[in-house]
Each structure stands twice: as structure tokens, then as C-alpha cells.
């Protein structure tokens, strides 16, 4: 295997990521290997390791593409409406995205780095960027000085919505309810935000003293 190089390093990186993404979309993470990527792009397996640190690095960059695609979709939904309307649109877009890209989205939670390996800062920034979308939608419910409470509320909402979408994409939602995922998400958002607006949630609690954590993608 192998061919004379006709691509720039950046083009070759994109070829590798395109091939890896296609493999994951069809076969899932279990089907991904350096050998299969190399076969598809018609380069030697060693070429992959010249472009990326290892296969985990390749996977992280595919995950980054997924996060960027979701962020691009969410970024168009914050222009109009009140907090409940905006958060509901974000949540419904999240649900739709997971159903449209089930294997790519599951990749974010199936892929584990070796013990003791931290997520790179550039990856953490992409996660924070997604959380910032939810925080922006919640902003009208939190006065100045409640930024950490707003961060916490965004993560509570994300965890709840993600739970519903996970059951839905796994076809397990019917085990606990006959309601649709879309209806459950709307109820979750409306109920939680009504509590915040009435002073029964994070907006009324004492200011948080510790930094609110980013929801973990890697367990």
C-alpha cells in the first residue's frame, strides 16, 4: 500500500479525518483502525502517525468536527424570543442533531482516553463554547453577579436534555414513558425555567463559590 504524496500536510490531515469520520458513521468506533483509514486514503499507515500523535488524536479531531457542527446549528437559534423559547429551541436542535448523527454523537461518550490523559485545551474550549450557548439563552434569568449560578443551571439543563436524548436515540424511551422525546424536553425546559424565574432555583440561591464544572464527555 502507499502512493506518491500529492497532498499538502493540511490536505492529508483532512483526508484522514474524512476517512475516519466515514468509517465511524458506518461501523461505529469499533470499526476504526489506522489500517482501515490508510486503505481508504491509499497511503501507508505510518502516514497517519506523521499527521497525528496516535489514533486517539484522530478520534478527538473527528469529535471536534461533531462539536463544531452542533455549535454552528445552535448559533442560529439565539436571536429572538424569551429565555424559555430560546432554550427550548436549543434543546430541540440538540435532539434533532443526535438523531441525525447517532454514531458520531455517541462517539463523544464511547471514546475514552488512556488513564491519566487529559483532554487537550482546544477540545475543552469547544465544550465550553457549547455550554456558553445555553448560558447565553439563560442570561435574562440571572442578574449580574450570578454568572456561576447561570453556568450551573446551563449544565443542569444539559444533563437533563442529554438524558432524554440518550434514551431516545437508543430506542429505550418507551421503557419509561409513552410521551415523545420532544414533548419531554419541552416539559423539562419549561418546568426548570419556571422554577428559576419564580426564585425557586439557582437564581435565588446564594452565589456559587466554586467554578461550575464542564459536563464531562470523557468518563
Where are these regions (language model features)?
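Append "Primarily bacterial transcriptional regulators
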Residues: 32-39, 48
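Amphipathic alpha-helical packing segments from all-alpha helical-bundle domains
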Residues: 117-142, 151-155, 183-194
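Amphipathic C-terminal alpha-helical segment
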Residues: 100, 157-176, 191-202
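An amphipathic alpha-helix adjacent to DNA-recognition modules
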Residues: 10-21, 25, 30-31, 42, ...
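Hydrophobic alpha-helical connector segments
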Residues: 75-104, 128, 144-147, 153-157
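Short linear capping/connector segments at secondary-structure termini
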Residues: 108-117, 173-175
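Hydrophobic/aromatic residues within well-ordered alpha-helical segments
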Residues: 62, 66, 70, 94, ...
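N-terminal intrinsically disordered/low-complexity leader segments
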Residues: 1-11, 200-219
Amino acid at each position: 500500500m502507499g502512493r506518491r504524496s500529492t497532498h499538502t500536510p493540511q490536505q492529508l490531515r483532512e483526508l484522514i479525518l474524512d476517512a475516519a469520520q466515514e468509517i465511524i458513521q458506518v461501523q461505529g468506533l469499533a470499526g476504526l483502525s489506522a489500517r482501515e483509514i490508510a486503505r481508504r486514503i491509499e497511503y501507508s499507515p505510518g502516514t497517519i502517525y506523521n499527521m497525528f500523535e496516535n489514533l486517539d488524536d484522530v478520534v478527538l479531531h473527528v469529535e471536534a468536527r461533531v462539536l463544531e457542527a452542533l455549535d454552528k446549528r445552535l448559533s442560529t437559534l439565539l436571536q429572538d424570543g424569551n429565555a424559555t423559547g430560546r432554550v427550548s429551541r436549543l434543546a430541540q436542535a440538540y435532539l434533532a442533531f443526535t438523531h441525525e448523527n447517532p454514531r458520531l454523537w455517541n462517539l463523544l461518550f464511547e471514546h475514552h482516553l488512556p488513564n491519566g490523559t487529559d483532554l487537550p485545551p482546544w477540545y475543552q474550549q469547544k465544550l465550553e463554547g457549547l455550554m456558553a450557548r445555553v448560558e447565553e439563552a439563560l442570561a435574562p434569568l440571572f442578574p449580574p453577579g450570578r454568572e456561576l449560578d447561570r453556568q450551573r443551571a446551563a449544565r443542569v439543563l444539559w444533563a437533563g436534555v442529554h438524558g432524554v436524548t440518550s434514551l431516545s436515540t437508543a430506542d429505550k424511551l418507551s421503557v419509561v414513558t409513552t410521551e415523545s422525546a420532544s414533548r419531554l424536553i419541552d416539559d423539562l425546559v419549561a418546568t426548570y425555567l419556571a422554577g428559576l424565574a419564580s426564585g425557586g432555583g439557582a437564581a435565588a440561591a446564594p452565589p456559587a463559590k466554586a467554578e461550575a464544572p464542564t459536563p464531562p464527555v470523557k468518563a
